[in-house]
């Protein structure tokens, strides 16, 4: 029997429903903030990622799925989405339509990492990118929007960690000081970091090897080298977050693993996933559009790891009341099944999640099916109930039951489900 490739995962129907609800809620949330969806391809020219992510990064050096196609072009399955969105933004001149472009995308990424819990070689991200605004208001708005999404998903114990990486004006002095420090600690670094320090010493700060992390903890801090403009920008971002009621920790050791970040960088972390604490991350990349051949346009964005988000939502047991409002109709007898089928189709037509058994089965068997389907309510209707004119609606969580007059179906069910949606 053929099996999955190592590091890949099938998302089965029950779990896929949770994925779809999260993706839908993200789209609605981002839309309320003026973001529009974009769908770039999953494959790009390799050069795009080398130039944007950085040739000295682990992603480019070790993790990308890169191959030569039959035409002789070197292509790569995207390891992240920002570079693709920027490429599309430039190629299609989206900057010509409006001075500010807010875009989001949801889809799979590919990295040949060591598979572990919550981390796969095909993984999925929700990305949001905003172009054309250099003001710190946009940084704060994106972080606020992200936390609104997490709140809507019912997530708890999440915290923003934020830092500034400076700009082309102030970063060189920091790099020089960092390089001097690392040269004296070469013996304590891993082989990769020893090789990288001359070309890009910042990569050492992002290394996950324990002995390199110990060295990083003692390294100079970039916030001590910020130019007046970067310092003011960072102060304004944190001030705006405070005004918005977003809690955060200033993490002077936070360095994202992509070369294109400037100024603001941040992660949202949780202590509920063990060592894999980051569930989202992003920052400002004011030089990337120009680097990839576009106009000099500032930009800021973030990415959310969907696999980790799904795991967290499953821990909370609910995305929202609406997401779990699922009705199963248990019909006993042909007459009851005929009526129930009509009700189900009418409710399906109105967009509600309703299911029933289309073949003759006992009540016990149907209740097991309803439970496996994660029904929130079961409507029990048999030929006897058809005679008395009173049906039973059971709440599967509380086990409470209520009677619904036969003449009120499906109107009573539509009203109930509409009211739950409004709540």
From Swiss-Prot:
Signal peptide range in chain numbering = none
A biological process term (GO) from this entry: histidyl-tRNA aminoacylation
Q: Per its UniProt record, what NCBIfam families does this chain match?
A: hisS (TIGR00442)
Instruction: Provide the E.C. number(s) assigned to this enzyme.
Output: 6.1.1.21
User: Which Gene Ontology MF annotations are present?
Assistant: ATP binding; histidine-tRNA ligase activity
The organism named in the record is Desulfosudis oleivorans (strain DSM 6200 / JCM 39069 / Hxd3)
Q: What is this protein called?
A: Histidine--tRNA ligase
| Catalysis performed (reactions) | tRNA(His) + L-histidine + ATP = L-histidyl-tRNA(His) + AMP + diphosphate + H(+)
Q: Which GO terms describe its cellular component?
A: cytoplasm
The entry's family comment says: Belongs to the class-II aminoacyl-tRNA synthetase family.
Location(s) in or outside the cell: Cytoplasm
Q: How does it assemble?
A: Homodimer.
